[in-house]
């Protein structure tokens, strides 16, 4: 395998803007490790590695750190493909353990840079590699700036090596004018603008036929010849380049890169190339590091532990996100609503709420979602899959979060407590929903009628009133409902199930809301009060009916005669007058009959012809007699309303 060497200008970091230099350096290493047809040289892991100090590491954000980790590990895997290493680099060990790479950097003395010697090299020896015992795995890579090797050049050698300095793996004959020199010992240091330069004039022997010029070596920077700045056009171009400039442009998205290898790496995201495949399940990944993390799912390995609660994770990035729960840190803020998030992926998903973007579409029904997990969960409606099963009762669920909430029913755990009324809940979402009863907040508005709701699910059910959609059908009787909850309650009519028992009188109910209303009989609670007269009611619909007395509203109209009624039950009774087709004199309003008729009074009149009539149904008795005996002196004719 062949990988391109970083271009010479990439090895020199600008000291004018440390943050920009770090970003550029990090972007550049993402291009290493891809093939290009150039001349070759041997390369060790150090040649494709970039280290950071603790201060520099702190300037990188999470995506940049993740990119650094992915590229470093992938480059190491590429080196391994050519043969087993003598030892694993420390930075790789730290990255695999999820540790920060700056923590392993050794201290480097701040003394004078070890001397370098430039010697004349015969033309026939140019470009010849002088091998020394290698201490790291090496491989062939194309060399940037190949044209330099065809010219008269000097040889770069270390004349004196400090006892604590690591031995280099390779030594090359380098053209002094064309290739900036770099001290490998101080490669990781950063020297500010105007930093001290070390004069190495005594170690420079001019090449025959060239003007002598002192080479000045900056600690941690590249050697250059100040008297001949034009000898380093590549460095000058790199430092003078703007932040948005680039030579290689992506045809898909227009993003520009300084190296063609960086562009090749970027194209993976468009092509979705997944070269790394799991042997267990066959799932493929774009990066080798993603495959390593995925394998921990099969092995169950969770090497990263939270120091606060002891929770373990298979991925270090997951641990970092988790630790923000303890610290309360939320560094990712939405510019539209100022809502903050602990993870950049959560912010990306949240932004789709504002944009309305729903990129994930169901192939079965065409429904679209703004999150892939929502689409995966939706697919289970079509397949009927419920992979998450409760170990206590065996009940299965389509998503893991529902199982987690359900398990708290068995454990009795209710960790989320309302600060207003001290009521506790087993999930944060239910607490949030409950708190809106105190604040009166109804953030979800219907676009058709403007009605507000405290929960998005309630709004979805309400919208079906306007659309007439009833997607939930009973298999027993074929009746359809707009909500799945209504269907569940309806099914109990067929099964006779009444799972909600009153603890006071042991009366059972098929739905929980009916139990709550019933319990108000025992407690005497009447939470719904009329603002006009102060009368209180135990149920909200009773208050709504009562308020029509004050407003005079009659919203129910008879289609036959146009008469208006304030209650739907009154309209239903009125419509019987039209449907039965009998004389008005023998039609009786069931409500009025039950109000003015005293059961048993007809049979008590001594009429022998009516002794076999069942006295339970007062309406049938009245139809037979066509007479309603008055109460205590009240007289009114048949078919007329009683006088007040």
Swiss-Prot record:
Residues joined by cross-link Glycyl lysine isopeptide (Lys-Gly) (interchain with G-Cter in SUMO2): 582
Domain KRAB: 43-114
Acetylation in keyword set: no
Positions of C2H2-type zinc fingers: 248-270, 276-298, 304-326, 332-354, 360-382, 388-410, 416-438, 444-466, 472-494, 500-522, 528-550, 556-578
InterPro entries listed in its UniProt record: KRAB, KRAB_dom_sf, Znf_C2H2_sf, Znf_C2H2_type
Subcellular location: Nucleus
CDD domains, per the entry: KRAB_A-box (cd07765)
One Gene Ontology term of the molecular function aspect: RNA binding
This protein's UniProt keywords: DNA-binding, Isopeptide bond, Metal-binding, Nucleus, Repeat, RNA-binding, Transcription, Transcription regulation, Ubl conjugation, Zinc, Zinc-finger
Entry's Gene Ontology cellular component terms: actin cytoskeleton; nucleoplasm; nucleus
Function description: May play a role in RNA metabolism.
Record family assignment: Belongs to the krueppel C2H2-type zinc-finger protein family.
Name of the protein in its database record: Zinc finger protein 74
Native source species: Homo sapiens
Origin organism lineage: Eukaryota, Metazoa, Chordata, Craniata, Vertebrata
């Amino acid at each position: 395998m062949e990988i391109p060497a970083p271009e010479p200008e990439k090895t020199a970091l600008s000291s004018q803007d440390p943050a920009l230099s770090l970003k550029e350096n990090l972007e550049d290493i993402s291009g290493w490790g891809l093939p290009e047809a150039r001349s070759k040289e041997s390369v060790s892991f150090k040649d494709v590695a970039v280290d950071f100090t603790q201060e520099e590491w702190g300037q990188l954000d999470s995506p940049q750190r993740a990119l650094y980790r992915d590229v470093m590990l992938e480059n190491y895997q590429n080196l391994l493909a050519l043969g087993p290493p003598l030892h694993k680099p420390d930075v790789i060990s730290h990255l695999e353990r999820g540790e920060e790479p700056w923590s392993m950097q050794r201290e480097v003395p701040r003394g004078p840079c070890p001397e370098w010697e430039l010697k004349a090299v015969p033309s026939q020896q140019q470009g010849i590699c002088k091998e020394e015992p290698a201490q790291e795995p090496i491989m062939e890579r194309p060399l940037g700036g190949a044209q330099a090797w065809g010219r008269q050049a000097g040889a770069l050698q270390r004349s004196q090596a400090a006892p604590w300095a690591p031995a280099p793996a390779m030594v090359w004959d380098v053209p002094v004018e064309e290739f900036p020199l770099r001290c490998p010992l101080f490669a990781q240091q950063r020297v500010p603008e105007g930093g001290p330069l070390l004069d190495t004039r005594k170690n420079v022997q001019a090449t025959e036929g060239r003007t002598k010029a002192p080479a000045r070596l900056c600690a941690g920077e590249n050697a250059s010849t100040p008297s001949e700045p034009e000898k380093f056009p590549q460095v000058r171009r790199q430092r003078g380049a703007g932040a948005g400039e680039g030579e290689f442009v992506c045809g898909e998205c227009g993003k520009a890169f300084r190296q063609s290898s960086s562009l090749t790496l970027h194209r993976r995201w468009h092509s979705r190339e997944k070269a790394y495949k799991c042997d267990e399940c066959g799932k493929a990944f774009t990066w080798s590091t993603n495959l390593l993390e995925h394998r921990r799912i099969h092995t169950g390995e969770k090497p990263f532990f939270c120091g606060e609660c002891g929770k373990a994770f298979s991925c270090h990035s997951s641990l970092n996100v988790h630790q923000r729960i303890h610290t309360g840190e939320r560094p990712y803020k939405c510019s539209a609503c100022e809502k903050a998030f602990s993870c950049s992926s959560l912010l990306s998903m949240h932004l789709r709420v504002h944009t309305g973007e729903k990129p994930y579409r169901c192939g079965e029904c065409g429904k679209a979602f703004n999150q892939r997990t929502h689409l995966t969960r939706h697919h289970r409606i079509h397949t009927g899959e419920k992979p998450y099963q409760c170990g206590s009762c065996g009940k299965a669920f389509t998503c893991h979060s529902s199982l987690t909430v359900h398990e708290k029913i068995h454990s009795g755990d209710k960790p989320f407590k309302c600060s207003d009324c001290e009521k506790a809940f087993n999930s944060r979402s239910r607490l949030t929903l409950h708190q809106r009863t105190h604040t009166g907040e109804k953030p979800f508005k219907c676009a058709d009628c403007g009605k507000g709701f405290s929960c998005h699910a309630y709004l979805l059910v309400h919208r079906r009133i306007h659309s007439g959609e009833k997607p939930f059908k009973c298999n027993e009787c074929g009746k359809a409902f707009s909500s799945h909850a209504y269907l569940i309650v309806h099914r109990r009519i067929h099964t006779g199930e009444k799972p909600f028992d009153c603890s006071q009188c042991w009366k059972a109910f098929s739905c929980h809301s009916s139990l709550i209303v019933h319990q108000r009989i025992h407690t005497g609670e009447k939470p719904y009060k009329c603002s006009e007269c102060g009368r209180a009611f135990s149920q909200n619909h009773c208050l709504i009916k009562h308020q029509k007395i004050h407003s005079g509203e009659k919203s129910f109209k008879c289609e036959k005669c146009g008469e208006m009624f304030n209650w739907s039950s009154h309209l239903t009774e009125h419509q019987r007058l039209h449907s039965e087709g009998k004389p008005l004199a023998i039609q009786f309003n069931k409500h009025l009959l039950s109000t003015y008729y005293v059961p048993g009074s007809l049979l008590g009149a001594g009429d022998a012809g009516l002794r076999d009539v069942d006295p339970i149904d007062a309406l049938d008795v009245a139809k037979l007699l066509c007479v309603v005996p008055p109460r205590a002196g009240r007289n009114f004719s048949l078919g007329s309303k009683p006088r007040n």
